[in-house]
């Protein structure tokens, strides 16, 4: 099956698996997905992830994180989509839930969080928001 938005597919898989309290979820591999998962790991939204297999069956196993029985990821929102890209400059970068969540941006300096983009003074494509 062809997926038109692989990033949204990954985010929804993670959200659905965490709402059903699954310990892991598998997503097809891409470098961009791995960079986004790196940020989610660094910010404490997932426990860990590992890349499994060889191309073309390469995939990423994401180990989800919970506080008691409550999932750490409450919700995710895909902002920029293949049919409607959404770009922000450094002044327009949103604060997610007053700083309790994160926004992930693709900038000229790589994929990073909203806080890192503000510190570097760069804008870019607003990929998603996680809280």
From Swiss-Prot:
Keyword Coiled coil appears in the UniProt entry: no
Cited InterPro entries: Ribosomal_uS8 (IPR000630), Ribosomal_uS8_CS (IPR047863), Ribosomal_uS8_sf (IPR035987)
Protein's UniProt keywords contain Membrane: no
Molecular function in Gene Ontology: rRNA binding; structural constituent of ribosome
Family listed: Belongs to the universal ribosomal protein uS8 family.
Entry function: One of the primary rRNA binding proteins, it binds directly to 16S rRNA central domain where it helps coordinate assembly of the platform of the 30S subunit.
Subunit field text: Part of the 30S ribosomal subunit. Contacts proteins S5 and S12.
Identification of the protein by name: Small ribosomal subunit protein uS8
